[in-house]
Amino acid sequence: MEALQRQQAARLAQGVGPLAPPRLPLPQPPLLGARTLQAPEGAIGVVGAEEEEGAEDEEGETPLAEEETAEQSHPGARCPNSPSSQSPGIQPHEWTYEEQFKQLYELDADPKRKEFLDDLFSFMQKRGTPVNRVPIMAKQVLDLYALFRLVTAKGGLVEVINRKVWREVTRGLSLPTTITSAAFTLRTQYMKYLYPYECETRALSSPGELQAAIDSNRREGRRQAYTAVPLFNLAGPTPRGAPGPASSHGPAPTATPNCPGPTQGSASGLPAHACAQLSPSPVKKEESGIPPPRLALPMGLASEATREKLAPEEPPEKRAVLMGPVDSPRLGAPPSFLPRGKAPLREERLDGPLNLAGSGISSINVALEINGVVYTGILFARRQPVPASLGPTNPPPLPSTGPPSSTLP
């Protein structure tokens, strides 16, 4: 019985082993001794044990293979000291600043340069705004170390902006002085790379003071641009009692006797409507004994503005009286005939030698350009009072200036 149980156990062990070599069935002799059966049983049992140990070895090797596969798919995950995890391409923060910005470190042999640049780049990295590239200006590397020293030596960025000493900073950096936007470029580069470090280490100014300095500088630039363009003084508001164009636009200076003779002669020969075709040009101040009041309109726009002003308000008869051919005032006429804006022209009594029309507005603003000089003034119509319903009439001939006639009735 014991021999049969051993034989069955050997057969079971022979069938379970996965790597057991194929064996031919042994012939069973009719008469087997106990010693004969023990030998194959022991051999079979040894083989089965070896097969079981081989299976266990294979199962133990499986995690190692999986670890090797994981290491191949994820290099550097096994341990932090592996060579693959220390490669500079995977962890760029291990590069030194000197290797990244070698050009800045090699601009000169100042021993404080490396210390300053390391401190600057480390501060910007901790601040969350790392310096990712070397600033370039005028096709060369911008020396941040020299720029910081020059600006802080003059009191900081705000002081440099207020005093406008960027040209000195440009010279100190050995940059070409022909750069038109050198001040703006240096200011923006300093604000981006160096101003936070200045506030942290020197505390020469605050961001609020910097913004105020920039706004003030911008306003001054606009003011200079405005003053560079010649401006013309337009007439201000006048009393509402004077409806005429002369009073609505304000009084204007007339030709004075101090003007040259040829200019006056040519001005008196031009028609009044020719002033609308004159091109604008700067008004030149001329010497006169009377201080000139404000100009009524700039250059040749006087008559056009008069036409537009009278179009919706005055009847056709008054427009014809206003824009018709008129005679220029005499050169020796005193300046007291100018309207003062106190009462309408039709109700004024003028003491001058001119006979003004009493039917309405009888003057226009004129601007003539002769030989590059613009003359402005008021022309008055010399007409007899006529009813407005009869329409305009031809002006009467000028009164004779000779001796009075001796023919009497």
Swiss-Prot record:
Ranges of Pro residues compositional bias? Answer: 19-30, 393-402
> What are its GO biological-process terms?
macrophage differentiation; positive regulation of transcription by RNA polymerase II
Q: Which InterPro entries match?
A: ARI3A/B/C, ARID_dom, ARID_dom_sf, REKLES_domain
- What keywords sit in the KW lines? DNA-binding, Nucleus, Transcription, Transcription regulation
UniProt lists compositionally biased (Low complexity) regions at 1-14, 235-257
The record describes the protein's role as: Transcription factor involved in monocyte-to-macrophage differentiation. Forms a complex with NPM1 to translocate to the nucleus, acting as a transcription factor that promotes the expression of the genes involved in macrophage differentiation, such as STAT3, STAT1 and JUNB.
The gene designation is Arid3c
- Residue ranges annotated as coiled coil are none
- Presence of the UniProt keyword Metal-binding in the record: no
Q: Regarding domains, what does the record say?
A: REKLES domain is required for interaction with NPM1 and nuclear shuttling.
List the biased-composition ranges (Basic and acidic residues): 306-320
Lineage of the source organism?
A: Eukaryota, Metazoa, Chordata, Craniata, Vertebrata
| PANTHER family reported in the protein's UniProt record | AT-RICH INTERACTIVE DOMAIN-CONTAINING PROTEIN 3C (PTHR15348:SF2), AT-RICH INTERACTIVE DOMAIN-CONTAINING PROTEIN ARID DOMAIN- CONTAINING PROTEIN DEAD RINGER PROTEIN B-CELL REGULATOR OF IGH TRANSCRIPTION BRIGHT (PTHR15348)
**Protein name, UniProt field:** AT-rich interactive domain-containing protein 3C
